[in-house]
Amino acid sequence: MARTCLVPGMKIVVILPTYNERENIQSLLDALHRITKNIRGYEFSFLVVDDSSPDGTEKLVETYKDKYPRVYLLSGKKEGLGKALLRGMEYAVEMLKADIIAQMDADLSHDPEVLPQFIRQIKKGADFVIGSRYIPGGSIPDNWGLHRKIFSVIGNSIVRFGLGFTSVHDWTGGYRVYQKKYYEKLHMQMGKYRGYV
């Protein structure tokens, strides 16, 4: 497979799925703006995909858009993370003309300070970069209960060894950066599936 390297001027859209993230979204957007302004030559946009949060997340993002013009809001009914990510990917590619898509959780469990490292790997020729909880330097959130931790470890092990992709340590993590071509391939294969992506 041919590798595609980042070219200056490419558009990078960071997708932030939200549900009741009013307490976190402003801090996250502030951090992302601060961090990405130091990555020269690329146009960053931030797409908040809100699932009708009853806590006012959507209203807060609307006011934030006045402060930063590259913040976009895509609202929809609550249909789960998978559907929100698919809506976000489609909007990022079709409307915002993304060349590169990044996705991260809006609850601050994914460190925005790591995003430049992901971008550097894409720039070096990687097609897909995944942030892993299961490698040195990674961690599982403190607020996860024992059952969730066990389910995550077992689920990832089944996928890693069942599919033979042992070099990827965290298949269920949501911190990713990838080339647009992966969305296009996924979009063709997914059809009407609306589960986790």
Question: What do these predicted regions represent?
Answer:
Residues 16, 40-52, 74-77:
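Short beta-strand/loop segment that forms part of the nucleotide-sugar
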Residues 21-37:
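Short, well-formed alpha-helical segments that are part of the catalytic scaffolds
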Residues 23-27, 55-64:
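Acidic helix N-cap motif at the loop->helix transition within catalytic regions
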Residues 47, 58-91, 95:
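Conserved donor nucleotide-binding strand/loop of the catalytic core
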Residues 50-58, 108:
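A conserved acidic beta->alpha catalytic loop
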Residues 81-89, 109, 113, 141-197:
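Conserved catalytic loops of nucleotide-sugar-dependent glycosyltransferases that act on lipid-linked
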Residues 97-109:
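Short beta-strand-to-loop acidic/aromatic patch adjacent to the donor-nucleotide binding site
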Residues 116-143:
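Conserved donor NDP-sugar-binding/catalytic core segment of glycosyltransferases
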